[in-house]
Amino acid sequence: MNLSLRRSTSALLASSLLLTIGRGATLPFMTIYLSRQYSLSVDLIGYAMTIALTIGVVFSLGFGILADKFDKKRYMLLAITAFASGFIAIPLVNNVTLVVLFFALINCAYSVFAIVLKAWFADNLSSTSKTKIFSINYTMLNIGWTIGPPLGTLLVMQSINLPFWLAAICSAFPMLFIQIWVKRSEKIIATETGSVWSPKVLLQDKALLWFTCSGFLASFVSGAFASCISQYVMVIADGDFAEKVVAVVLPVNAAMVVTLQYSVGRRLNPANIRALMTAGTLCFVIGLVGFIFSGNSLLLWGMSAAVFTVGEIIYAPGEYMLIDHIAPPGMKASYFSAQSLGWLGAAINPLVSGVVLTSLQPSSLFVILALVIIAAWVLMLKGIRARPWGQPALC
């Protein structure tokens, strides 16, 4: 990796960290903000948050696909500008509808940045560097989510608007970093490999369909597992013990990701992807079974969370490698945009968990999640078979 590419990569990783700190400092407190500023009831807040998050994911799909037609450096700068504008606008407006729309803009912009960031890595890095850098980026995201919420807690005690201003300030530095150090993406001509940029390609690629469905199910299991666990513990115990469990599970998850993500992710390659993804699935299942038997033991909750997190550590770079492998040159952002639909799995987890916990035995929740992650693994294998692994992506 030459000096220019190393600077560009470092600038993008730092930008990813800062933007995530800003988002982490605000997202957990949006419910408090809507309640305190606009006196919304709990159910209305739930509707507002769901609408904003869903709009963000859906629109990021379209904007992410279009990113393949433009310079990715400029596209990331535009996404960060929209991200910062949303945070600046929310404290200044006095209309709940506008607040929800600006929050949707923030989520859309963040998703677009994440998609284009992956595409930039895929276009500019060597095959041996991609999974290593993506693992580092995933570590940066987890560090951001570790720093952001406590920082937001300190600020919200001073003023409900301060977390939004912090997020806007955090956005300013990435704009500077990217403008100065990130090199422009060279236009990739896909016709040399027989493929032409077209959204229709996404609909015709069976491997992409299977991988996206697999990502949806995997996200459903791991994307919101902390809230899922808290819902479960509140049913079998009480709110106080739920807080203790979450206080154990989240630090274990963050510590495991920060310390192991790079060392595990860098070992992923086409030769061992199936074996490692199978091992990751097994870790998910063992962790979920462990949750069932953890009961009142915080030690067992922590140990189960550690095993569960190993599955997450393997799946994150593994899913990236699968999509990068099948995406034709010049359509990386389009493919990562389609993959981002899988994030909707995490969005519906709290709703489904609530229904399961009120309708079935509480332990049924983790049995269902174990079956879901096994289904995700099966769909992932179908995707690999649909596109011969180890061969160039063809359309």
Residue spans for each PLM region:
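Cytoplasmic helix-loop-helix junction between adjacent transmembrane helices
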Residues: 104-141
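Helix-to-loop junctions at the C-terminal end of transmembrane segments
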Residues: 59-71, 260-273, 357
